[in-house]
From Swiss-Prot:
E.C. number: 3.5.5.8
Stored InterPro entries: CN_Hdrase_a/SCN_Hdrase_g_sf, CN_Hdrtase_a/SCN_Hdrlase_g, CN_Hdrtase_asu/SCN_Hdrlase_gsu, Thiocyan_Hydrolase_gsu
Protein name: Thiocyanate hydrolase subunit gamma
Cofactor: Co(3+)
Hydrolase is among the record's keywords: yes
Originating species: Thiobacillus thioparus
Cofactor binding description: Binds 1 Co(3+) ion per subunit.
Modified residues (Cysteine sulfenic acid (-SOH)): 133
Pathway(s) annotated for this protein in UniProt: Organosulfur degradation; thiocyanate degradation
Organism domain of life: Bacteria
Gene Ontology terms, MF aspect: thiocyanate hydrolase activity; transition metal ion binding
Organism lineage: Bacteria, Pseudomonadati, Pseudomonadota, Betaproteobacteria, Nitrosomonadales
Gene name per UniProt: scnC
Binding site for Co(3+): 128, 131-133
Length: 243
């Protein structure tokens, strides 16, 4: 699924932070209700849920960052990542079947992982328009803004504008391709290796591959090793659009 739309629309140019998340997702409310019902019906216990929750909160983006760093250094491994993301994940310690406490994954997490390789003329960015599908075993918990209806609705319609709000201004000749995650397929982005990193080790490279880079709303830069504190700001140079 791809989108690359530029339209005309007047925007306020004040530069105050504009938090994207001001809504409670209906799916979060639904999750709590379904979870309580499942425990009541004996499908799993509250202890099972606690163990799973503890496991999920140990996850982070480091395995995905290492996957990208390794691919930057090894063309054959990069090829494997693009062809079979699930198999490539094993090299960074993630087995999508046996890593979760259940030892058989879950319908939510055991699925096809696709690694989307950027190029100088193509930028990928990931969203889940239906709910909040996210490759947790390799990327950890999704950020709150990723789950917000605001991000999910707008990215598909105005990807260039939304990326600009994240501070990522892309030249007009760069195509933006939006990948829509779903129950069966999850995505991570393999950004272009930045200039100024020649001779870097895998560990050094992995440090600059942040979670936001792996979702596609940022690009790696030497010296930048953390996500922006406020993920969404008003763009300094907004991309105008019509409705």
């Amino acid at each position: 699924m791809s989108a690359d739309h530029d339209h005309d629309h007047d925007h306020d140019h004040d530069h105050k932070p504009a938090p994207m998340v001001e809504e409670v997702s209906d799916f979060e409310i639904l999750e709590m209700a379904v979870r309580e019902l499942a425990i009541e019906k004996g499908l799993f216990s509250a202890e099972d849920h606690r163990v799973w929750k503890d496991y999920v909160h140990t996850l982070g983006p480091l395995p995905a960052a290492r996957l990208v760093a390794k691919a930057w250094l090894d063309p054959e491994y990069k090829k494997l990542c693009i062809e079979d993301g699930v198999e490539a994940s094993k090299a960074v310690g993630v087995n999508w079947v046996t890593s979760p406490p259940t030892q058989f994954g879950t319908p939510s997490d055991y699925c096809n992982l696709r690694v989307l390789a950027d190029s100088p003329t193509l930028k990928h960015v990931v969203v889940c328009t239906l709910c909040s599908c996210y490759p947790r075993p390799i990327l950890g918990q999704s950020p709150e803004w990723y789950r917000s209806p605001n991000y999910r609705r707008r990215l598909v319609r105005w990807p260039r504008q939304v990326l600009a709000e994240f501070g990522l201004q892309l030249p007009s000749e760069v195509q933006i391709r939006v990948a829509d995650s779903n129950q069966k397929t999850r995505y991570i982005v393999m950004p272009v290796r930045p200039e100024g990193t020649d001779g870097w080790t895998e560990d050094q490279l992995a440090e600059i591959v942040t979670r936001d880079c792996l979702i596609g709303v940022a690009v790696p830069k030497p010296g930048i090793t953390v996500n922006a504190k406020r993920p969404v700001l008003k763009a300094n140079r907004p991309v105008h659009h019509d409705h």
